[in-house]
Structures are given as C-alpha cells and as structure tokens.
Regions:
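N-terminal binding-site loop/beta-alpha segment at the start of enzyme catalytic domains
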Residues: 1-82
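A short acidic, helix-capping loop that chelates divalent metal ions and anchors anionic groups
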Residues: 24-29, 91-97, 215, 291
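Alpha-helix N-cap and loop-to-helix initiation/capping positions
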Residues: 31-39, 65, 69, 98-109, ...
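Short, acidic/polar
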Residues: 33-47, 102-118, 162-168
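Acidic (Asp/Glu)-rich catalytic clusters
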Residues: 49, 71-83, 116-119, 148, ...
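Structural motif corresponding to the early beta-alpha repeats
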Residues: 77-102, 129
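Active-site groove signature of glycoside hydrolases
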Residues: 115-133
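Beta/alpha (TIM)-barrel catalytic core signal, keyed to glycine-rich beta->alpha loops juxtaposed to Asp/Glu
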Residues: 131-316
Length: 316
C-alpha cells in the first residue's frame, strides 16, 4: 500500500490503520462482546504482516485492557514497531463509570499509564478522545502541548471535535490530525470539517468507515439479532428500527456495485471514505485473524467515476 503523509506531521501512514476498540472485550459499557486476548494479539500481528503500519487504541477500551493487549502484541514483535495512536480524556472510576476529564494533572497521569501499558517510551499520535468537558479543552490541549515538548508525544490531535472547537486549540498548539466518524451513513464532516482541515493542513483519520460493521455486506436482521448481550451496538439507533431496514437495503445496493467491481461491500465502503483527498487513512477494526485480510483491499481500490455516481444515487 502506498503511504500517505499525515497533515503537517512527518508521519506517513498506510491507507488503512488497525482499529482495536473491540479488543477491549465486553466487560464495559461500550464493549463489543466477549473477546479472546490471544486472538487479539494474533490479529495485530497479522495486520502488520499484511503491510499495515499503524494502529489506533485508547485507554478506555476495556478500561485499560485494550492497551495492555496492544502492549503484549508489541512486546512479542521483538523490535518491529508500528506507529501507535492512543487517546486521553475518557477516565473511569473503580466501579467502571466513565468520567470525562481534561485537567492538566489527569492528562499527565493518563499519558504515563498509557506509556506503561503499551510498553513504549513515546506515543506517536496522542489525541483528546472527546471534547468533554467543553470548558476544559484549552487546559487539556495545553497539557498535551507540554507532553510534546517533553518528548513523550510526537504529534498531537483530537477526535470528535467541531470546527469551532478546533479554532480554539490552534493558537495554543497546532492540531496535526483529527479523528472523526465518517462513512456512507455518517457524512457530517463533509460540509465544514473537511474544508477546514484542508485549509489548515490537518490530516483526517476517520473511524467507523464501515459504520461499526453495518457496511460490511454481512448485515441481516438475523445477524443483528445474534449480537451478544454485551455488544454496545444493540443500543445503537443505526442497528434498530426504523434505521435498520434502510441500512439493510443500503447493504444490498452496495453489494451489487461491489460485485460488478470485483470487490466486497466492506472494501467498497473503505475506498469510498479514502476517495477524499484530505483523508489520510481509515481506521478499520478487526478482532480475529482473517478479518483484516477481508478489508485491506479497500486501501488499494480506486472507485471508477461511474460507480461513484451510482453510489451517490443510492445515498441520495
């Protein structure tokens, strides 16, 4: 896969990055159901063997567990080090209650915890997970700027921020990248965020390009009904009526386009996100060996103009 430069940074990413959210397991509010840690480690190794050069994680995934698993996978690589992206702001109490914090002291504590769990000396890409509390985003961003100067973080970014919030950060420290949700179903960044990032050389690394699996081509009503009780998608409006019927119909239409192109609906969904010049790389989740091999072709697929026009009609 051809590497792409991430905004103003000196990082060059593969068009697909491995998302590890599901590797946090199901024992927390936003889990994806039970997960085998050994399979998670094998999945990380397989993604790197296939050529992916970066992965995205967060402390809150499994309340620290996901970063521990990633750290285990990195240790077993014996020196072969991918680019690591992780986050701060989503803290939790002893009972598992998630609490947003953007105070200087909490962020300095979080970065030390992440460095320890991951087993690394520096975090390549560090970002505020959510802009909450909003009144503290300047303090939180100033703390991350300190971490960059201290050499504990290479490049600083944010996730789920609006243009208005990005503008508040820029005078403190330049934003190198933004991680927003973006897919055929969720296109909210197209009108304002993408143009702003283009104007300010901010790289975009969208998450959920397959809308949590809804655009994988595998979704049926029975598939949704079979989701584990601890899978947070059971409470996602996109996985429930009245939106589910629309999303299943969208899957059927995309499957027809993908078949004509000799690809899969999942790869088509990923390539559609990557068609945006300002998008550097798409975060694609996997939780067991074989899954990333089913989607990695999306990083190489160039969708013909007639197919893009057909997709536009489907999405209209």
């Amino acid at each position: 896969m051809k590497l792409r430069k991430l905004g103003r940074s000196d990082l060059h990413l593969t068009p697909i990055g491995l998302g590890t959210w599901a590797m946090g397991g199901g024992d927390w509010k936003f889990g994806w159901g039970p997960q085998d840690d050994a399979l998670s480690v094998r999945t990380i190794h397989e993604a790197l063997d296939l050529g992916i050069n970066w992965l995205d994680t967060a402390p809150v995934y499994g309340l620290g567990h996901c970063e521990d698993v990633v750290g285990r996978a990195l240790k077993e690589l014996k020196g072969r080090r991918p680019i690591i992206s992780t986050k701060c702001e989503r803290c939790w109490e002893p009972d598992g209650t998630i609490v947003p914090r953007l105070k200087r002291a909490s962020i300095h504590r979080e970065v030390e915890d992440s460095l320890r769990r991951l087993g690394v000396d520096v975090i390549d890409m560090y970002q505020i997970h959510w802009p909450q509390p909003d009144e503290d985003i300047e303090e939180g961003w100033s703390a991350i700027a300190e971490l960059v100067k201290a050499g504990k973080v290479r490049w600083a970014g944010v996730s789920n921020f609006s243009v208005a919030q990005l503008k508040r950060l820029q005078p403190i420290h330049p934003v190198a990248f933004l991680q927003p949700p973006y897919s055929m179903i969720n296109r909210g960044i197209e009108s304002e965020i993408i143009p702003y990032c283009e104007a300010h050389d901010i790289g975009i690394i969208p998450y959920s390009p397959m809308q949590k699996g809804l655009l994988s081509g595998k979704v049926t009503r029975a598939w949704v009904d079979a989701l584990p009780a601890t899978d947070h998608r059971r409470g996602d409006p996109q996985f429930n009526e009245p939106l589910l019927t629309r999303n299943i119909a969208l899957n059927d239409a995309l499957r027809a386009v993908a078949t004509r192109l000799g690809t899969t609906p999942a790869e088509l969904a990923i390539a559609w996100v990557l068609r945006q010049p300002r998008v550097t790389s798409a975060i694609v989740g996997a939780r067991k060996p074989g899954q990333i091999a089913e989607t990695i072709g999306g990083g190489r697929l160039a969708i013909p103009s007639d197919a893009l026009a057909e997709i536009a009609k489907v999405l209209a």
